[in-house]
């Protein structure tokens, strides 16, 4: 025991040396273990009666520490001090499981945290109401972040609407910076609630706010983001089928995200037959207007062209109120289709029945003068009668129109925002408010189309 006291005294009076903490601890541990071994071998120290507290301290002092143990301790934070009830809630006090969690166990763990429970979210304002659903602005009690709660009423005789099932099944697998994120799903006897990330504006509101006069640089940034999200969907054989400004959500940073996948479909083969009762009338391609039920990703590209025109001019391209009027507006601008511009069109019974006048095509530049030459070229490549001839989203991303955005926008990870690049910034809009972006207020619902 005297040897131990002398050793501790020498250690406390020693002069610090320029060595690392690990080296000092390693040397101390080695000397301590050697001294302990020598003491046991010499047998010179007389055993003395120790109190229980001193016995515990002695056992702790005699414990051998490896360098692995020391490194583990050095890598820990100084003092975490997490509340015990929080640790119990997350079950962090239990040792790690030797095997990966099963799907059922993982669901149970998420449920313990609060996912999948209606009481986890607080409803704030009603954003709008439709036939099957009501959308609320809400807040998560877990994260304190704002969310959008899409509450779908369940009819007992019908169950969940097919649009809701479709939206959930598709969105749960889509992880992209330009696609709205589905955070949670809550199923009760009376409702199905989809919890989305909250974006408090959309492209329609943005246009209204800037007096329908956007900066052309901002048009390019929004267009690139739209194509980026759509290319991600099309690469996974998913068609949106309902593109319009109200379904393109925008946050305060200017990030644009595809939303409202209620009409979207996973396309297994190009020839699969679908319903032609899809897509808002103004953004519906002529082949669908004439009754086509066999289509692929080009159905979305016509709508992209209409949205590009609307951003550049501040007004919708083909605002028809009926199918016949919609076709009439299209043919007056692009010319009445012929077998040369649209092979097979004369064999479509609906086309023959309408008996349209023979319109000649008009130059797009005279209708969208703010678009530059490359922009007009891109628009022309999207507004083609023959669906398979329309430019794809992937090809459109590489169009010279976007060259001014630089090369780095094409190298981003799917989940990375283009605004993570310092060279990508919105500019002032020349509209009556003259702001690059500002929230359009906290008033009425931003859209009805989410239902």
From Swiss-Prot:
Endpoints of the signal sequence: none
GO BP annotations listed: positive regulation of myelination
InterPro entries named in the record: CDK, Kinase-like_dom_sf, Prot_kinase_dom, Protein_kinase_ATP_BS, Ser/Thr_kinase_AS
Gene: Cdk18
Reactions accelerated catalytically: L-seryl-[protein] + ATP = O-phospho-L-seryl-[protein] + ADP + H(+); L-threonyl-[protein] + ATP = O-phospho-L-threonyl-[protein] + ADP + H(+)
Tissue expression from the record: In brain, kidney, intestine and at a much lower level, in fetal tissues.
GO molecular function: ATP binding; cyclin-dependent protein serine/threonine kinase activity; protein serine kinase activity
Superkingdom, taxonomy of origin: Eukaryota
Catalytic site: 242 (proton acceptor)
Keyword Repressor part of the UniProt annotation: no
UniProt-recorded name of the protein: Cyclin-dependent kinase 18
Domain Protein kinase: start-end pairs: 121-402
Protein residues bound to ATP: 127-135, 150
């Amino acid at each position: 025991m005297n040897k131990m006291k002398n050793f501790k005294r020498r250690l406390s009076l020693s002069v610090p040396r320029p060595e690392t903490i690990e080296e000092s601890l390693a040397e101390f541990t080695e000397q301590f273990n050697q001294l302990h071994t020598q003491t046991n071998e010499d047998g010179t120290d007389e055993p003395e009666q120790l109190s229980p507290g001193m016995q515990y301290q002695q056992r702790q002092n005699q414990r051998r520490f490896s360098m692995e143990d020391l490194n583990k301790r050095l890598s820990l934070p100084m003092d975490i001090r997490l509340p015990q009830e929080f640790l119990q809630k997350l079950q962090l006090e239990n040792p790690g499981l030797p095997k990966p969690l099963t799907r059922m166990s993982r669901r149970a763990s998420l449920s313990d945290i609060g996912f999948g429970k209606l009481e986890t979210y607080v409803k704030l304002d009603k954003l709008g109401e439709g036939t099957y659903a009501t959308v609320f602005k809400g807040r998560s009690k877990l994260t304190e972040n704002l969310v959008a709660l899409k509450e779908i009423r369940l009819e007992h005789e019908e169950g969940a609407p097919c649009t809701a099932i479709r939206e959930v099944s598709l969105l749960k697998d889509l992880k992209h910076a330009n696609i709205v994120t589905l955070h949670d799903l809550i199923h009760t006897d009376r409702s199905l609630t989809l919890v989305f990330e909250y974006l408090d504006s959309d492209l329609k509101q943005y246009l209204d706010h800037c007096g329908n006069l956007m900066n052309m640089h901002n048009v390019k940034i929004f267009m690139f983001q739209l194509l980026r999200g759509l290319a991600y969907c099309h690469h996974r054989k998913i068609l949106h089928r309902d593109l319009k400004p109200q379904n393109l959500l925008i946050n305060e940073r200017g990030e644009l995200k595809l939303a409202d996948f209620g009409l979207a479909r996973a396309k297994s083969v190009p020839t699969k037959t679908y319903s032609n009762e899809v897509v808002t009338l103004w953004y519906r391609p002529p082949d669908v207007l004439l009754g086509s039920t066999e289509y692929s990703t080009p159905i979305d590209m016509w709508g992209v062209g209409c949205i590009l025109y609307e951003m550049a001019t501040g007004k919708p391209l083909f605002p028809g109120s009926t199918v016949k009027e919609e076709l009439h507006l299209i043919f007056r601008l692009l010319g009445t289709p012929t077998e040369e511009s649209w092979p097979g069109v004369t064999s479509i019974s609906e086309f023959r029945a309408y008996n349209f006048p023979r319109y000649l095509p008009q130059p797009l530049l005279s209708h969208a003068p703010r678009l530059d030459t490359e922009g007009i070229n891109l628009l022309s490549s999207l507004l083609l009668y023959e669906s398979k001839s329309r430019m794809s989203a992937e090809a459109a991303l590489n169009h010279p129109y976007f060259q001014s955005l630089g090369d780095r926008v094409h190298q981003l990870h799917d989940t990375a925002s283009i605004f993570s690049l310092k060279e990508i910034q919105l500019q002032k809009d020349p509209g009556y408010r003259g702001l690059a972006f500002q929230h359009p207020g906290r008033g009425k619902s931003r859209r009805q189309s989410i239902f």
